[in-house]
């Protein structure tokens, strides 16, 4: 099924261990390269869906000069969107707790922008998943943030961690998207378009 990917040297440009884990689950050969410093600011005029697309394209642009003829570069960015506000990675522990308090008892949207780049073509797409949290107590938020230190996660949580077990009451869309890479979509896009 994934034989069309064998013609590429797949390069995942990501610092995210979750994206690495998800790509490894496909049982395909790939390399990981750490991201250089990429400016993750974005124009204020962008919608929630456009923000992670823009950032994933900026990440791809930072790597383009290192690509070879057979390279397939995968870059991604994930945000949490609630009431017109972006929740990216928290700045510190206090910010992480504030984010989880804002998400508590509400439904938010996790949006991941993915860019697939070869020397011949670039394809970008966004995937959205709705996630509903139970009302979280301060003790639950404190425990999670202190024990799991979710400073590298959009919205200050990992759905695959303790907070997901006790706090997520509903999920509509791709679970893997909430982890950081909607893995089904890149596979189908490479098969159809690259």
Give the ranges of each region predicted by the language model.
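A short beta-strand-loop structural module common to alpha/beta enzyme folds
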Residues: 32-38
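Anionic-ligand binding patches
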Residues: 3-6, 10-11, 46-192
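N-terminal beta1-alpha1 ligand-phosphate binding loop
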Residues: 5-26
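Generic structural signal for helix capping and beta-alpha/helix-loop junctions
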Residues: 40-42
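Residue-level detector of anion-binding/catalytic polar loops
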Residues: 29
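Surface-exposed, flexible loop/turn segments at secondary-structure boundaries
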Residues: 18, 38, 122
């Amino acid at each position: 099924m994934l034989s069309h990917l064998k013609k590429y040297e797949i390069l995942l440009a990501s610092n995210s261990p979750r994206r690495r884990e998800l790509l490894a689950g496909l049982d395909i050969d790939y390399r990981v390269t750490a991201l250089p410093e990429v400016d993750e600011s974005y124009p204020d005029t962008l919608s929630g869906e456009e923000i992670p697309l823009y950032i994933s394209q900026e990440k791809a642009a930072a790597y383009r000069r290192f690509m070879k003829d057979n390279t397939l570069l995968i870059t991604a960015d994930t945000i949490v969107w609630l009431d017109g506000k972006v929740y990216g990675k928290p700045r510190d522990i206090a910010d992480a707790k504030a984010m989880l308090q804002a998400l508590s008892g509400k439904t938010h949207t996790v949006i991941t922008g993915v860019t697939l780049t070869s020397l011949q073509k670039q394809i970008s797409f966004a995937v959205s998943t709705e996630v509903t949290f139970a009302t979280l107590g301060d003790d639950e938020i404190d425990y999670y943030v202190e024990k799991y230190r979710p400073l590298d996660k959009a919205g200050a949580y990992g759905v695959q961690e303790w907070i997901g077990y006790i706090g997520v009451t509903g999920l509509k869309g791709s679970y893997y998207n909430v982890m950081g890479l909607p893995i089904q979509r890149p596979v189908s896009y490479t098969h159809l378009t690259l």
